[in-house]
Amino acid sequence: MRSWLAPSVPKLAGAGPRLRLWDSADRIIRPVTPGRTATMYVCGITPYDATHLGHAATYLAFDLVHRLWLDAGHQVAYAQNITDVDDPLLERADRDHRDWQELAAEQIELFRTDMSALRVLPPHEYVGVTESVGLVVAMVEKLLANQSAYVVAEGEYPDVYHRIAATEDFGYVSGYGREEMAQVFRERGGDPDRPGKADPLDALLWRAARPGEPSWPSPFGPGRPGWHVECSAIALDRIGFGFDVQGGGSDLVFPHHEFSAAHAQAQHGAGAADEHRRFARNYVHAGMIGLDGEKMSKSLGNLVFVSALRERGVDPSAIRLALFAGHYRADRSWDQGLLREAQERLARWRHAASLASGPAAHDVVARMREHLANDLDTPKALAALDSWSLEAAAHGGGDQEAPALVARAADALLGVQLTP
């Protein structure tokens, strides 16, 4: 599946410092140590209600990771899926009397348009689940063969499940205890009460065909992929086992990332005691976005959409700055005051970048690099550029190259355009 056109990224002199990120599994900030090519998998959208600000905040956070790796001199291999067949999509299509494939295609195109407007660097592999059913079938076959999976015999539908007991160190991604797992599993799409399961927490790998639902053939009967195994199979196929960063929103820590890792490690016979034997070497998660102090969610009907902001004439660079005003890991709130402050900040920066000269800027670029490399500390990076722009506006400066350097740095590191 095609992604979207990549924006140009200016090259800054020298190389940025090594990136350090909070690893959700180990619960520490530590250096990310890729080889020449840095590898990243970020879970994509289920294509309905795209693109709300929660989506945008997540993909902007990992856009920073992408940009900082490029600035540090790495090549980047970045894969992202699209969950273009799943219960929520089918339910929305049924509610709205739409063909589910048409709804998915419409929403995927809207997402592409929004990501392009926000100047998000596209993934190199942008993969729909419907394109990848063969990968999932092959993986489920392997899990059945090594007894990490089983077919539920009870009931009308022979669904296939993963045995959590088959995965060494199950639970290392979230750090949850059994009781917390059970609660969150039920809240986020799990089926602990399904008769015939070996363990209530065992996760669905293959949903046997039901009347009126899309299905594909497989050796274990027609059906469609479970949610978690889709990402396991796509990531293993496109960037391989033991990639550098698994990314997503914090609501994916459990069960999604926990089970994606469990499926992959059950296939590979690997454990989590050593980061080099994990599905991903680092698990990185972005916080949730609320609206006016309340949780932003589909169920509450208070989603704010990127496309709606753009239709109102909001500059996408201002949207980036508004979301960068808080730390990516923090749960934070969107309101009109936040957007207004971002628009004012963007105007100040653009004015300073338009001056014929300004204060020397090499130090501010170095500070931006250091702050961003320290677990994507955007508030401090923005403050560094604020200081330079205020000084430039108030007192000028004798460095004729400084405004252009600052504009290139804002573009390369933050994806924010200051000049036409």
UniProtKB/Swiss-Prot annotation:
A motif ('KMSKS' region) lies at residues 295-299. The keyword Membrane does not apply. It is an enzyme of class 6 (ligase). One of its GO terms (molecular function) is zinc ion binding. Its cofactor is Zn(2+). Keywords: ATP-binding, Ligase, Metal-binding, Nucleotide-binding, Zinc. Its EC number is 6.3.1.13. GO terms for biological process: cysteinyl-tRNA aminoacylation; mycothiol biosynthetic process. Coiled coil: none annotated. GO terms for cellular component: cytosol. InterPro entries: Cys-tRNA/MSH_ligase, Mycothiol_ligase_MshC, Rossmann-like_a/b/a_fold, tRNA-synt_1_cat_dom. L-cysteinyl-5'-AMP binds at residues 43-46, 58, 81-83, 227, 249-251, 289. Zn(2+) binds at residues 43, 231, 256. A motif ('ERGGDP' region) lies at residues 187-192. It catalyses: 1D-myo-inositol 2-amino-2-deoxy-alpha-D-glucopyranoside + L-cysteine + ATP = 1D-myo-inositol 2-(L-cysteinylamino)-2-deoxy-alpha-D-glucopyranoside + AMP + diphosphate + H(+). The keyword Kinase does not apply. Belongs to the class-I aminoacyl-tRNA synthetase family. MshC subfamily. Monomer. This is L-cysteine:1D-myo-inositol 2-amino-2-deoxy-alpha-D-glucopyranoside ligase. The gene is mshC.
